[in-house]
Amino acid sequence: MAFRVLDSSAFYAGIPFSSNEPSYITSLVYNEIDHIKKDHDAVQILIETKRLTINEPEEKFVTTSIDAAKKSGDFSNLSDEDISTIALSLQLGAELVTDDFAVSNVAKNLNIKVIPVMTDGIKNVVTWRYYCPGCEFDNYLISGASTTRSRIECPRCGNRLKRKPMKN
């Protein structure tokens, strides 16, 4: 029997409500789908019938997921919820149900099977190269840049970096 870890897009598509397979979410995803929980008792029923389990990934899997996200260049596009779903999938050896391209890219880099929900999913794994449109700074490693999840700034001039896929 395949275990699946769900991100919030699976709930928007109704996946957990139409499947009898056991599924897992993290507490961060559980909190993210709060507006769905308010409208439906279905999420609570899934938990009570053990078709949905809330589980937290171990720190070493979170760290591995963050490292993989930084290596692929996707880290700035991932939320804590995203990182937690990747980490839990890695820890459990579970399939990851998501439509998020950045989540899919990192998961596939970690050899996690990704199940898209309402899209065709990603075709190729990508490593992103960051560059500055202002001073033409170009480096796929963003460790020298000032990084936050909302903005990646050029270490030379402070402009917002853009990204493009690296040619393999």
Each predicted region: which residue ranges?
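Feature 3881 marks metal-assisted phosphotransfer/nuclease machinery
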Residues: M1-L6, A10-I83, A87-L92, A102-N168
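Conserved SAM-binding loop
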Residues: L96-V97
